[in-house]
A protein has these predicted regions:
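Short acidic-hydrophobic, aromatic-tinged amphipathic segments that line or gate anion-handling sites
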Residues: 2-8, 89
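N-terminal catalytic cores of NTP/NDP-binding nucleotidyl/phosphoryl-transfer enzymes
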Residues: 8-72
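A short acidic, often aromatic-flanked loop/helix-cap motif at beta-alpha or helix-coil junctions
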Residues: 9-13, 95-98, 155-160
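Residue-level signal for inorganic ion chemistry
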Residues: 27, 80, 119, 179, ...
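N-terminal Rossmann-like or analogous alpha/beta NTP/dinucleotide-binding catalytic cores
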Residues: 59-145
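Glycine-rich, Lys/Arg-enriched anion-binding loops that position phosphate/diphosphate groups
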Residues: 142-241
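Phosphate/ribose-recognition catalytic cores of enzymes acting on nucleotide-derived substrates
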Residues: 195-312
């Protein structure tokens, strides 16, 4: 898959089929778009590409939305490649780009620089300054700029439209089973281990404190997890805690994981944490003894929850 970090692409990629969108999470709805676009591209003997944006527009406009993404950029690109994407146009979403009107986006970016023959978007696609552009506007200019627009109806689960926003809500309410079903894989985050206050060790559980950057924060509480350390293939079982340590007066939310059978220090190591099962909500305990007692029970429940099948 050829990657272009601007809309200026090689001549051989012009006249292709492209899908446009943010594609955060690359869920089943997005996958439907890719499958149909690839099918049309093959039928017409042209290449298939994706036009997307970095960072996500909502993260650019709302600086407080730092914890928002469902998937890392690296994962998105790997999934694009899996679905047979020939090239990727990854446009930097900045102040200048955000001011481009919908009509100028069609003329100056799509027509003059990418020059596609087929464009695939979901029927609720919005674009351009203040999101004034929609599928009707895109279709209106198709004849003038020599492209055909194909709208993809949203993929539905039990009558409800699948969306990245809906999956975020699933994670924030602890509904991991539904989130994973809509993603068609087990949701995970990547993060680096940083030094903490070593409270876990004092409570009898050596833990890794993970720095979470940009990812959506799931519901605070205890989780059954699986962990991959660095680039190794081996997967470890464990228990994860997302919260602020209310028993000790904490306020900042962070992720702490206890990897079963691992006692060595993992500072600065990258961990991939798969969220398998939500066990319970966060809770403030009267003292450390009561917390330890509950932690022992949590480990038992986590081991039961880890019997759930992992989907990569």
């Amino acid at each position: 898959m050829k990657i272009f970090n601007s809309p200026i692409i090689s001549k051989k990629y012009k006249g292709s089929a492209i899908a446009i969108g943010n594609f955060d999470g690359v869920h089943k709805g997005h996958q439907k778009v890719f499958k149909q676009a690839k099918k049309f591209a093959k039928k017409n003997k042209i290449r298939f590409g994706i036009l997307t944006f970095t960072p996500l527009p909502v993260m650019f406009f709302n600086k407080k939305a730092s914890n928002y993404r469902l998937a890392s950029e690296d994962l998105k690109f790997k999934i694009f490649k899996k679905y047979g994407v020939d090239f990727l146009v990854n446009i930097k979403f900045n102040k200048t780009f955000s001011k481009i009107s919908a009509i100028k986006f069609i003329k100056n970016i799509i027509y003059k620089k990418i020059s596609p023959k087929l464009i695939f978007v979901s029927n609720n696609f919005k674009f351009g300054n203040k999101r004034k552009g929609n599928v009707n506007l895109l279709k209106k200019f198709g004849k003038k700029y020599d492209y055909k627009l194909l709208k993809i109806n949203p993929f539905r689960n039990q009558g409800k439209m699948i969306s990245s926003t809906g999956i975020r809500k699933c994670l924030q309410t602890g509904n991991l089973d539904l989130a994973n079903k809509l993603l068609s894989r087990t949701w995970f985050i990547d993060g680096y281990v940083k030094k903490g206050k070593k409270l876990g060790r004092k409570l009898g559980y050596r833990t890794c404190n993970i720095y979470i950057k940009n990812y959506i924060l799931p519901k605070v509480g205890i989780y059954a997890i699986k962990v991959v350390i660095g680039n190794k293939r081996k997967m470890y079982n464990g228990i994860g805690y997302l919260g602020s340590r209310p028993t000790f007066g904490g306020k900042e939310i962070f992720l702490e994981v206890n990897i079963f059978g691992i006692q060595k220090k993992l500072y600065k190591k990258r961990l991939r944490v798969y969220f398998i099962k939500f066990i319970r909500m966060d809770k403030k305990f009267k003292n450390s003894a009561k917390l330890i007692n509950q932690m022992n029970k949590d480990v038992i429940f986590a081991k039961k929850g880890l019997k759930t099948k992992l989907v990569l």
